[in-house]
């Protein structure tokens, strides 16, 4: 369907029609097609229309801050925002991110995410979104979008739609893991389920005026997400009335004419495969219009939608070229990175865009910390004589906070999971640093053991301690990185790196053992949660750069925990239903993922099966006594 400028889009639409009416066919096509992977400074960049003084648009990850840059903030993940249940904090985080993206010369932020929604608790990228409850996700999705766009940057609601696992999302990626498939996985779903669950947050995004939507790698009912006329034309543009533009995920564009007719508006990053110098669109889209296979109005509509989003957020008033390079931290380099061609110029200006955003990050980290259990152990007084800090998750990454590319390792404290949905840390305050500072204020003793396998040393220290604070984690991320054999999706819900044994070693020797969990989602706590010496349990999620400070604010009672769990904590992995497709089930054809459970995911599924969880969706204690 044509964009028509309905509602709050009217002025932006009229301006877009006026400017696009002045463009040649080539100029319109230029807006729709990325220039290619690693060519320009951003992870995605379109052509511009210099004749009309329109620069190419810079698109950059991620949903929690600026990826592949510097002097920017690392915000708490979406799952932490969900745990706050706080619309205002979601907005403030979005606004702060938008300001940073704008100050770096970025026009389109590739976030926030509500796909995956969180159908499976072990889905690799659930943490990038909010919660498996579509209503909670939708509200916070919308507030985040409003914040980003009020700062003058186009927000991108992603990944549309039913992109619920990492396994088999891309043919080449699957081949790298030893699976030979002809096409990516197909999420097969009925109309009721898609409307009541997976489309719901995107409806909220459209109502919030989101400028861009990213279509996903997977197929939906055996039609690719970026050339699926039912999901793009019927559901999104006709039924929801979406007025912005649809971009492909990077490498999710599979056809020229078919995707154009199905509702795709922008090809990212523009080349068919990275650095191939070939494109389904660009020159080929121009030819398709000239030979009549794509109607002229469709390309007009693509360009109008792109420019309407640009004008709607006021980007024309704030536009500046990107002042950083995604591909190098060197100050000077060739303008075109991949071929190492063009003028040799200043590519990184090292602009500090952090403002005072550490304040909202610290507050969000504290306000998203869920108190799962408390037997009068918390808050701490600060006057505990001997404090034991136990576990690698309390300490620093021995490679440095950004030492693993796209955070693709689980070293030290977990404050951000892995993949393209990450940002560079400007610093990372660890729990060990923050707790030590608290103890030293009161002249106490504090000791840290950050080797999860040093159990005899843990037992010895725990026996002497007034309180033992045990730090454990569970990580996940995007499928192009495998960490400890977890190919994006988690292999299980158990704690990583001997975490259960670490907790038991402390609890068997210290009658005041407090467990802090940093994780991407639910973990299995059945072995120790009811141990009489485990006096408190906190879930701190993925809190970003102020991790230790946020946690100390809660531990020492400066912040009364008010967060509520945005997901269910089951007794076993099986309690959630077995939804993740990990093996080929269709020969070498596209793996088939039937959403036969319908709407019954997370707590809905627990209720339907009469399955009692350990901690319910929405559970969270506070220090208040009545």
Regions found by a protein language model. Name each.
Residues 1-626:
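Glycoside hydrolase catalytic-domain context in secreted enzymes
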């Amino acid at each position: 369907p044509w964009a028509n400028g309905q509602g709050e889009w009217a002025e932006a639409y009229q301006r877009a029609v006026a400017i696009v009416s002045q463009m040649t066919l080539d100029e319109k096509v230029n807006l729709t097609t990325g220039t290619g992977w690693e060519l320009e400074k951003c992870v995605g960049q379109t052509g511009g229309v210099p004749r009309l003084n329109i620069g190419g648009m810079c698109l950059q990850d991620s949903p929690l801050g600026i990826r592949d840059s510097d002097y920017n903030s690392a915000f708490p993940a979406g799952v932490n925002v969900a745990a706050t249940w706080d619309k205002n904090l979601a907005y403030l985080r979005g606004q702060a991110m938008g300001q940073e993206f704008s100050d770096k010369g970025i026009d389109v932020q590739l976030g926030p995410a509500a796909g995956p929604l969180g159908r499976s608790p072990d889905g690799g990228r659930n943490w990038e979104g909010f919660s498996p409850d579509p209503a909670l996700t939708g509200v916070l999705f919308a507030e985040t979008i409003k914040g980003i766009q009020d700062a003058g940057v186009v927000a991108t609601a992603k990944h549309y739609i039913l992109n619920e696992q990492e396994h088999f999302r891309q043919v080449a990626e699957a081949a790298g893991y030893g699976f030979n498939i002809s096409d990516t996985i197909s999420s097969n779903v009925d109309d009721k389920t898609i409307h009541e669950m997976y489309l719901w947050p995107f409806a909220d995004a459209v109502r919030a005026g989101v400028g861009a939507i990213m279509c996903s790698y997977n197929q939906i009912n055996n039609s690719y997400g970026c050339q699926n006329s039912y999901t793009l034309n019927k559901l999104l543009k006709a039924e929801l009335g979406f007025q912005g533009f649809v971009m492909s995920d990077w490498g999710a564009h599979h056809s020229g004419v078919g995707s154009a007719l199905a509702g795709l508006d922008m090809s990212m990053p523009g080349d068919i495969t990275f650095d191939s110098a070939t494109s389904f669109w660009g020159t080929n889209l121009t030819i398709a219009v000239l030979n009549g296979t794509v109607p002229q109005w469709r390309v007009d509509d693509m360009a109008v939608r792109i420019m309407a989003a640009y004008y709607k957020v006021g980007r024309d008033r704030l536009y500046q070229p990107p002042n950083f390079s995604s591909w190098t931290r060197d100050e000077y380099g060739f303008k075109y990175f991949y071929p190492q061609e063009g003028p040799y110029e200043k590519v990184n200006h090292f602009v500090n865009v952090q403002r005072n955003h550490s304040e909202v990050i610290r507050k969000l980290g504290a306000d998203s910390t869920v108190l799962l259990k408390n037997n009068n152990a918390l808050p701490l007084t600060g006057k505990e004589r001997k404090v034991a800090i136990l576990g690698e998750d309390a300490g620093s990454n021995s490679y440095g906070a950004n030492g693993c590319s796209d955070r693709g390792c689980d070293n030290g404290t977990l404050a951000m999971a892995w993949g393209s949905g990450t940002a560079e840390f400007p610093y990372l305050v660890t729990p060990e640093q923050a707790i030590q500072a608290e103890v030293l204020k009161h002249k106490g003793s504090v000791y840290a053991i950050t080797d999860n396998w040093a159990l005899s040393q843990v037992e010895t220290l725990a026996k002497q301690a007034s309180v033992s604070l045990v730090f454990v984690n569970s990580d996940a991320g995007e499928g192009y990185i495998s960490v400890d054999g977890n190919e994006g999706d988690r292999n299980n819900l158990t704690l990583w790196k001997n975490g259960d044994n670490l907790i038991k070693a402390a609890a068997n020797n210290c009658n005041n053992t407090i467990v802090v969990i940093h994780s991407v989602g639910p973990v299995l706590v059945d072995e120790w949660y009811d141990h009489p010496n485990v006096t408190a349990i906190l879930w701190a999620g993925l809190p970003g750069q102020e991790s230790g400070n946020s946690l100390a604010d809660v531990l020492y009672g400066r912040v009364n925990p008010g967060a509520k769990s945005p997901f269910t904590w089951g007794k076993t992995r099986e309690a959630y239903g077995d939804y993740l497709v990990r093996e080929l089930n269709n020969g070498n054809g596209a793996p088939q993922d039937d959403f036969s459970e319908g709407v019954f995911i997370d707590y809905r599924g627990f209720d339907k099966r009469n399955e009692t969880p350990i901690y319910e969706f929405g559970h969270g204690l506070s220090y208040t006594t009545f």
